[in-house]
Amino acid sequence: YLVARFTPAFGAVGPWRGLVIGLGAASTVFGGLRALRQTDLKLVLAHGTISQLGFMFVLFGLGTPYAVTAGCVLLLAHAAFKASLFMSVGAWPVFAGVSVVSAASMAGIPLTLGFIAKEAGYEALVESGSARGALVLAVVVGASMLTFAYSTRFVLGTLFGVHDAAPQERADELARPARGFLAAPLVLATFTLVAGVAPFLLDPLVGAASSSLEPGTSVHLKVWHGVNPALLL
């Protein structure tokens, strides 16, 4: 939030922009590599958060209108899928579907809000048209491959893990969660899918956030932008 707020004022001052973008790019790779090394599911999510925040640093540090929009969408997508994953991770089989949907958004699978955010972020970096932007884009794409890898590992470890010999027996020993607790991750996962299929519904919300950071920013989120470099990446 502070980076997003301060970049319009400090973006042209000294090394601010380069420092923020460089720190963000390094964090995307560091967080992704650390997430792949974890054996605790919550630690996978925690280190994955470092990677996602690094991507946000890159976008808000870049500071162009489209990058700011992409950063706001990524912030919203990350809040939805990561909150859902943290609430659903555990032994209860009822959370399996929620975990798969939320992990798909984390990985940037099409028809999820995570995909909309990731494509917008790529497009913002492509449009920057600079050598630095191309280098950062290459780093972010590499980090996104790590994100896909640890998201897949999360799902496979949750559904098909071999270290837990009797997950159902362990689940039976736990107190059943309250209905409200069951509903919260389900609502967030549903939001991820609905926003991924109809992202234009978020235009007023994302537009208001983007305009507060970069006045005059116009937001028109779509599922299909045609075949372009961002989609191919």
What is each of the regions a protein language model found here?
Residues 1-173, 197:
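Hydrophobic transmembrane alpha-helices and their helix-loop junctions in integral membrane proteins
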Residues 153-233:
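Cytoplasmic/organellar membrane-interface segments at the starts of transmembrane helices
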